[in-house]
């Protein structure tokens, strides 16, 4: 009987926000320790995600969370930075998978193992759901920490997304080093303020 493939699920969080790094996670689930309630992180409440993240870290065969910085996003563009974060997450796994199943329609070019793209994989594949939860909770934690440093921007509430509150805060208080300079609203503010950073 052939050996069962060791599959890592891979997903990202934070492609759309105007601030903060983009995060990715890779998870190899343990078939002997199924985790109930895994679903795409976007359909779970914050409390559910936090609870599941603890279980995933405890019961998965292996997991890794990685990121690509704001500087890397601005240098490479968000797509390439996301692929870089995903590659780092797979490379960082303490157990090498036979296959990486990636949420979405493309596989990172420099992945260290064979990859398979699965559209809406975060809703179809348990390991990808687990990865989406770890990536999202790690990213949210970074934005909560950023909120503690700059409470006037409301990062803990909008998590860096271009909400009316966030855009108003940029207009009132300016652009921070944590903002992505190549993203439309940030770029526009910098252009109208001669590139000033606060």
From Swiss-Prot:
It catalyses: Endonucleolytic cleavage to 5'-phosphomonoester. The keyword Iron does not apply. One of its GO terms (molecular function) is RNA binding. Its cofactor is Mn(2+); Mg(2+). It comes from Chromobacterium violaceum (strain ATCC 12472 / DSM 30191 / JCM 1249 / CCUG 213 / NBRC 12614 / NCIMB 9131 / NCTC 9757 / MK). Residues 5-195 form the RNase H type-2 domain. This is Ribonuclease HII. Manganese or magnesium. Binds 1 divalent metal ion per monomer in the absence of substrate. May bind a second metal ion after substrate binding. Keywords: Cytoplasm, Endonuclease, Hydrolase, Manganese, Metal-binding, Nuclease. InterPro entries: RNase_HII, RNase_HII/HIII, RNase_HII/HIII_dom, RNaseH-like_sf, RNaseH_sf. A divalent metal cation binds at residues 11-12, 103. Belongs to the RNase HII family. The keyword Membrane does not apply. GO terms for cellular component: cytoplasm; ribonuclease H2 complex. The gene is rnhB.
């Amino acid at each position: 009987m052939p050996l069962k493939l060791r599959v890592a699920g891979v997903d990202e969080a934070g492609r759309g926000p105007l601030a903060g790094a983009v995060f990715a996670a890779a998870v190899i689930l343990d078939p002997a320790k199924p985790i109930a309630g895994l679903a795409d992180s976007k359909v779970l409440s914050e409390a559910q995600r936090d609870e599941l993240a603890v279980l995933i870290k405890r019961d998965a065969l292996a997991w890794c969370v990685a990121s690509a910085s704001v500087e890397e996003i601005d240098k490479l563009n968000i797509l390439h930075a996301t692929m870089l974060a995903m590659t780092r997450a797979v490379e960082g796994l303490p157990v090498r998978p036979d296959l990486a199943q990636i949420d979405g329609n493309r596989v990172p070019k420099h992945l260290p193992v064979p990859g398979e793209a699965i559209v809406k994989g975060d809703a179809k594949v348990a390991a990808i759901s687990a990865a989406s939860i770890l990536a999202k909770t790690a990213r949210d934690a970074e934005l909560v920490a950023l909120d503690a440093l700059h409470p006037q921007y409301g990062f803990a509430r909008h998590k860096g997304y271009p909400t009316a509150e966030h855009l108003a805060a940029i207009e009132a208080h300016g652009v921070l080093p944590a903002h992505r300079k190549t993203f439309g609203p940030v770029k526009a503010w910098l252009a109208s303020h001669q590139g000033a950073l606060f």
